[in-house]
Amino acid sequence: MVKIRLRRTGKTKQPSYRIVVADSRSPRDGKFIETIGYYLPTRQPKVLEIKADRARYWLGVGAQPTEVVVKLLKRVNVLDEQGKVIAEA
């Protein structure tokens, strides 16, 4: 199964994350298929950048987002409150 999840990068106690599409059997920071964005939670304000078209594509072909990624996708209006994909505007 393919998952959309966070891949941890950054320094000790200064995490940053890449939002990646990866096989569910791969380790958290291991091999991935594609990077579709990044999230910097330690910056003020927090930085979130997602390629919405690629996220919609992967969701359309059956990739399952993790709980945290679902929240991030809702922030950038890729998913609605029910977790359904919003068509491009």
UniProtKB/Swiss-Prot annotation:
- Pfam families to which the protein is assigned, alphabetical: Ribosomal_S16
Quote a single Gene Ontology cellular component term: cytoplasm
Give the keywords, sorted: Ribonucleoprotein, Ribosomal protein
Protein name from the UniProt record: Small ribosomal subunit protein bS16
Query: Which SUPFAM superfamilies does the UniProt record give?
Result: Ribosomal protein S16
Q: Which GO terms describe its molecular function?
A: structural constituent of ribosome
Q: Record's family?
A: Belongs to the bacterial ribosomal protein bS16 family.
Q: Name one GO biological process term.
A: translation
Q: Report the gene name.
A: rpsP
Highest taxon above the source species: Bacteria
